[in-house]
Amino acid sequence: MLESEVSGNAPHSLWIVGAADICRIALECIPLPKRLLAIKVSGTWSGMPWAIPDNIQTLLTSTWEPKFDTPEDRAHFCDSDMVCVYKILGSPPNPLKPPEIEPPQMSSTPGRLFCCGKCCKKEDRDAIAIPVRYTATGKSRIQKKCRAGSH
């Protein structure tokens, strides 16, 4: 599913406990940017640890600690060489671009319809077209409104 068009940019949750090295291909197929929560435990599992590929930029790195029920649990965690890491990987998303507003067009066609609020009239001479927007005023009724002003 990760390699198909079905996934799109939908958020994914993928939990891997141990053996991240054999899940490397799945991890690398998740679209960027992605978040990574990891607990690195030294010497517990055999095999190669999965490392973030060099071509993936790390945007944020932070360490965290799990919640401990007793002081002994905290001491055991500190003595175990475990490291809890939170990272955001990948390129930041492109900021939304503001919509481009086209300048009014000059009309050289006589008799073109121009909007001037609720009343529309034909203009027989060259004029600047005023953009028209439509707003819903009821379930099936649509009313024209002029961006230039209200009449």
Curated annotation (Swiss-Prot):
Organism: Gallid herpesvirus 2 (strain GA)
Name assigned to this protein: Uncharacterized 16.6 kDa protein
One Pfam family linked to the record: US2
InterPro entries given in the database record: Herpes_US2_varicellovirus
